[in-house]
Structures are given as structure tokens and as C-alpha cells.
Amino acid sequence: MKYPQLSLRETNAPYMEEMKTAAAEVIEGGWYIRGKYVSRLEEQLCAYLGCRYAVATGNGLDALRLMLRAYIEMGVMQPGDEVIVPSNTYVASVLAITDNGLVPVFVEPSIHTYNLDTSLVERAVTARTRAIMVVHLYLSLI
């Protein structure tokens, strides 16, 4: 069976010139950590999401680690709790879970979307399940 391949070139094509310009501005500005572009991104995220705070991180692993740590600090989760995650996930998802003392529960993806198969998720939920980490590796949200 052949599977369609994700073409990042096609996906990014409509935005390429804008991305090149933005990247050049950041490089020429010399601020890769914090700085006005990161502050602007955080402000725009707050406006878009309708929230008061947003924190840009260096990578997805850091973001996932902080999110799960916040849930633990708020008492929503505790070490030993389970987090359902797609079996075809990127390793950062699993590292964020295990680094926080949580237990990953792997669920197979749908053959049609490559995302979590919802019928299998229902069967994987236990009394220790506290979260489902939705990972859309192939730009498909459904």
C-alpha cells in the first residue's frame, strides 16, 4: 500500500517569501532568544487565543514538558498518572511525559488520518488516565 507523502515545499510555498523576510530580520537583529520578535509573537498569540499570557519556548519538547509540569503543579495530574499518546508520535511527546514521572499509554493511529484512532482511545482510558496528547505529525488535524 502506498501512502501520500507530505510535501513541506508545497505546504510552505504560499508563505515562502514572507518567511524568508522574517527570518532575515531576526538574523540581522541578532536576538534569537527573547527580544522584540519573541515578544511580538507572544502578544499575537495572546490576542489570537484570547488569553492573558503566552510563553514561547525553544522547541516543542520544552513546551510539552512545561505544560505537563504546570498540570502537576496545579494538582490536575500527579506522577504515575497516564497520558494517552499516538504510537507513531515523535519522541519529544514521550520524553515530556516520562520526564514528568507520568506514564505514556500508546494507542495506534487511524490508517486514514495517521492521528489517534478515537475508537481505540476509548478502550485505552483507565482510572489513571488524566490526559490525551493529540499529535498531528502530518498536518492533518482530523
Predicted regions and their residues:
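Phosphate-binding glycine-rich loop
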Residues: W31, K36-E82, A96-T98, F106
